Structure formats: C-alpha cells, structure tokens
Amino acid sequence: MAFFEIKNARIVGVSAGVPSRIISNLDLKSGDGSISADYSPQAFVEMTGVKERRISEVLTTSDLGFAAAEKLIADLAWDKATIDAVLFVSQTADYAFPATACILQDRLGLSKECYAVDIALGCSGWVYGLSMACSFASSGVMRRIILIAGDAKRRAPQPLDPLFGCAATATAIEYSLGAEGFKFHFGTDGSGYDAIMIPDSGSRNQVKPESFTLHEYEGKMMHQMQTHMKGMDVFGFGITTAPKSVKKLAEHFGFDYQTYDWFLFHQANMKMNSMIIKKLKLDPAKVPSEMYNFGNTSSASIPLLLVTQIRDIINDKKQKFLCCGFGVGLSWGTVAFEDAIHVSELVEVDDSAENYRYKL
C-alpha cells in the first residue's frame, strides 16, 4: 500500500497566478464549437457549480507559474541562489521537449546547480509533486524547493470548454529539522486511462489531419485533440475513491480526520464534491470551493483554494489540512499536515504582458 510519512520538511508559502480574462458560462450558446446542442447555461452552472473561468489563449502554464513563483519568492524574501530544485507538474508543457522545468530554472534566475524536472500528472498532481519535494527536502540535502503546478492553454478551444479554467500555483517547501511533516496515501488504476484523455497528440496516436475532424462524443461535437471524458465513469470514480483514500489515510496513521480544520479537495465539479462531503460526514464550512469562479484547474485546484478562498483566515496561522487530488490516470493522492503557511495574494496576468512570455 502506498502510505508513507515525511518529516523534517514543511510548506513555507503558496501563491497562484491566473489570467485576468474572465469568461462566463452564462454567455455561451448551444452549438458553439464543442458546446452541446442542448446546452443550457443555467442548468450547467447548477450541475457543475462552474459559472465563470479564467481563460487565456496566449499564456502558457509556465507563464502563470512563473508569475506565481516570482510573487512567492519575493514575499518570502528568498535568495534565489538558495533554491535547490524546481518541480513542474502539468499536462500542458511548453514543448514536447525540453522539460518546462528547465526553462523555468533559467527564467526564474535560479542557480545552474538547480535540480529541475517535469511531472506529467493532472488532478492528483499537486499531492504527488508535494511528496517528491518533501522527500528531497527532508534529508537536508536540498533545503529549498519550488513546486509549480497547474494547466493552461489546453488544446481545446478555451472559451468553449465550460468546465476547465487556466491557473498555475507555486508552493515553497523547505527543510525544517523537527517538523512533523506530512502523511501521504497514493493510488493508481491505469485500467481507467481512457476515462479522461486526449486521444491524439502523443506518440501512440500522432497528430494527423484527421485529428481535427469533428465527431460526437458524450453529446458534444469534438475532435481528437480535445479532452475526452467519460462523465459517469469519472463521477463514480471520484465519489468512491476520494472518501476511501481519506479514511484509509486516517486509519493507517491513527488519527481522527474530523479534527482537521480544512479539507481541500480537487475541484472536479460541485455535485461530485458534495457527495464526497456527505460520505465523509464533513462540515461544509470546512470544505471551501472555488469552482464557481475558476472552474476545474487540474493540479492547481488544491493550492488555489488556499489563495482564493481562505487566505484571510489562515495566512501565517497554524492549521490542520487534509488534501485529496483525484482524476486523470486514473490517479489519486491524499495528504495530511499541520502548518502555518504564508499565502500570497492572487496574481492576475494580462494577456498583453510581454514580460510573462518566454521566447527561445
């Protein structure tokens, strides 16, 4: 079983970057692009909880992550020369290669002795990335690490994909002798690899002219370069796996999860998360949601909650957090920890801000 505990490491701070452009799902019309013919704006909002999203067809995940990281590093007054690693968790890298983390090392002005690596995960990605960063930091060999996580500029036409929004977050992790650290549980079910996927684009099904031919899928007109999701399969997976993972983590490490201050779940959709809350018998006041204003932001969704929903309550105050990410893969991860985290103000990035675009 994938349970483990990491001590002597802590989260020092969290920040987030989003596009300044806001798209309202109430303004979308049935039949536009991949919007289904029977699309009802109000019904969609009521079903998913997503009213509006931050969208950019220009800015990449690394652009938003760079903005978030710059803000966080400045707020923490970290000397960039002391940052030992940068981890980039995303399914929307700048290029097929090189790794986007390498580009961010240079763009952020980090040392050439810096460890840099990409992690190709989605909804569970922040928890996985956190486990890697904390593992590196716990020994003291790497003392400061920046974890950037998120997705943006997907292959689907952004304004016409009513569920997903663009965002990237930066999390600062450092070595801290004696820190209680983190308790993790992870799982994978690769038999559901096609529950959420882009069929063409990789080396298995390479891009060809036919990749852009529209076909009907789950009531939508789509092409093979867009995200295909088996809605009911994903819903069933989410409402089953997330509660089980939380309970397994608590049972394995012998703690009462009801005593935790905050429960931060991946922001998949409102109905799914409502059922998870009911299954775990949680106080809804302890389970913040950002879907209404930001949609599903993939691996950014958990840390984005800290920035956009509870910053004023938790900033620099010791709190107990239980976080669970679940989705594409199929993959899931849950983490429990207690800490006082500095939470930076949200960074809004304008499409026209040329300083956020990195050109080789």
What would you call each of these model-derived segments?
Residues I11-G13, F44, L72, V86, ...:
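Buried hydrophobic positions in well-ordered alpha/beta secondary-structure cores of metabolic enzymes
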Residues A68-D84, K244-D261, Q309-I314:
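Phosphate/pyrophosphate-binding loops at sites that engage ATP/ADP/AMP, CoA/4′-phosphopantetheine
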Residues I83, M142-I145, Y260, K318:
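Short, high-confidence coil segments that cap the C-terminus of an alpha-helix
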Residues V12-S15, V89, A120, I145-D151, ...:
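Short beta-strand segments
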Residues S62, F66-A69, T92-A93, D106, ...:
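Claisen-condensing/thiolase-fold acyl-transfer catalytic domains that form or cleave C-C bonds
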Residues M1-V58, L160-G236, T240, K244, ...:
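Condensing-enzyme catalytic core mediating Claisen C-C bond formation in acyl metabolism
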Residues G31-S36, T92-I103, A268-K271:
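A structural motif shared across PLP-dependent enzymes of the aminotransferase-like
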Residues G140-T169:
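Flexible, glycine-rich active-site loops centered on histidine and acidic residues
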